[in-house]
A protein has these predicted regions:
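Beta1-alpha1 glycine-rich phosphate/pyrophosphate-binding loop at the start
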Residues: 2-77, 165-186, 384
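FAD-binding core/adjacent interface of flavoenzyme oxidoreductases
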Residues: 2-10, 64-151, 226-229, 239-241, ...
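A Rossmann-like FAD-binding core segment of flavoenzymes
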Residues: 31-35, 78-95, 101, 169-265
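FAD-site-proximal beta/loop scaffold in flavoenzymes
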Residues: 124-146, 218-226, 231-308
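Cysteine/selenocysteine-centered motifs that mediate thiol-based redox chemistry or coordinate metal-sulfur cofactors
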Residues: 398-412
Length: 412
């Protein structure tokens, strides 16, 4: 590329990570050429607003973030409902719709797709849904208008958000999971009891150690699920939350290293192939603050990735230093907040916890190699101190065991 030519950037995936990267590429490289590809027919919308939309707490218009005019103003060539079929790393081109798009730097921000219903009969049924996209949210909401009962299946955050939404829509709500308590890969048993009490207080029927053996159909719809223990539960609407499969297929046949968690990249979000980057849910990246590799599917993490990766795509060397966070409603106006690592990501974590029955909240902090690396907060008004915890994580300061209990009372 001649010195006078503008740099060319291709971004595959127009979610929060990809669109944020495009925005910051334009900010830092005013004369560049940007092509942004997305599978859906929509410009960027706020995925963390889908649960409140499903609860009918906000209108759909509040979910949308960027329109076509914004892309035009920022001179971002937007290609919706357009799949990038493959990448030619030798020629440094992305191929989509029979056309080649040359790049000087390429970003893969394709995220993941929901795993299908985990038993026969669910896939393709008109009343069985995943909960990842705007169209799915519309379909579930429409189904709930006439539903009398709904079932959330899975022990994940997605299943929890479905169960919470079903309860808020005043249908008979069931939450079915294989685990011994909700969110068992993230929470301990004490926190699981807290969630159990909150769910039941909101009218949710909890089914632990329960696995769906079959979605039983009648005239195209599922009439009930049959459990492996022989029990049955009938409903009009079924929401499935069984994790994601990462969309790495665009890199098939390339030298880019991919793990079962996503695309391997360093602390600058660059892969083993120079000039190819990954960001958002799909990035299996090295975090220099927490000093380990992991994948984090949170909204704020995707945005932070987008900002950092843009700097590095234009030739910078900026490491990612943010701390991932997740926060959502937890039945009856309570909240669940998670920050940093969890035992699911680092099994060697040491935990300290506190329950305040009077205030109705639970709090746990996670330590690894004597450093604070994460935590969980449950209950009403139980987010005080979170910023201080995040700063402590970033500081890498060691905390001796005798000092850790007192940290549970941080409120500043």
């Amino acid at each position: 590329m001649a010195a006078s030519e503008s740099r060319r950037y291709v971004i595959v995936g127009n979610g929060f990570a990809g669109t944020t990267a495009a925005e910051h590429l334009r900010k830092h490289d005013p004369d560049c050429e940007i092509h942004l590809f997305g599978d859906e027919p929509y410009t960027l919308y706020n995925r963390i607003s889908l649960p409140p939309m499903l609860r009918k707490q906000i209108p759909e218009a509040k979910v949308m973030i960027r329109d076509r005019a914004w892309h035009e103003t920022n001179r971002i060539d937007l290609h919706l409902q357009t799949r990038v079929e493959r990448i030619d790393t030798a020629a440094r081109t992305a191929i989509a719709g029979g056309r080649e798009y040359p790049y000087d730097a390429l970003l893969i921000a394709t995220g993941g797709r929901p795993n299908p219903a985990p038993a026969p009969g669910g896939t393709g049924a008109e009343n069985v849904f995943n909960f990842q996209y705007l169209d799915e949210t519309r379909a579930i909401s429409e189904r709930l208008e006439s539903a009398k009962a709904a079932i959330a299946i899975g022990g994940s955050y997605i299943a929890y958000e479905l169960a919470e939404a079903f309860a808020s829509r005043k249908v008979e709500a069931h939450w079915v999971m294989r685990g011994p308590y909700a969110l068992h890969r993230v929470l301990d048993d004490v926190a699981g009891e807290f969630v159990d009490a909150a769910a039941k207080a909101d009218g949710v029927h909890m089914h632990y150690g329960a696995e769906v053996a079959e979605f039983v159909r009648s005239n195209g719809s599922v009439s009930h699920v049959r459990l492996k223990d022989g029990g049955t539960i009938a409903a009009d609407c079924y929401g499935v939350g069984f994790g994601l499969t990462m969309n790495t297929e665009v890199l098939d046949g390339t030298e880019v290293e991919v793990s079962r968690n996503g695309i391997l990249c360093n602390d600058r979000m660059e892969t083993n192939v120079p000039g190819i980057f990954a960001a958002g849910d799909i990035a299996d990246f090295y975090d220099p603050t927490l000093e380990m590799r992991y994948r984090m599917g949170t909204w704020n993490n995707a945005g932070a990735h987008g900002k950092v990766v843009a700097l590095n795509m234009i030739g910078g060397s900026e490491p990612y230093h943010d701390v991932p966070e997740y926060s959502s409603l937890l039945f009856k106006g309570q909240t669940i907040t998670q920050f940093g690592l969890s035992p699911e990501l680092q099994p060697e974590i040491e935990l300290v916890r506190k329950i305040d029955a009077g205030k109705g909240w639970y709090r746990s902090l996670f330590f690894w190699r004597d450093r604070l690396v994460g935590g969980i907060m449950l209950g009403k008004g139980n987010r005080a101190g979170k910023r201080k915890y995040v700063e402590a994580i970033k500081s890498k300061e060691p905390f001796p065991k005798p000092d850790r209990e007192a940290m549970l009372d941080w409120t500043a």
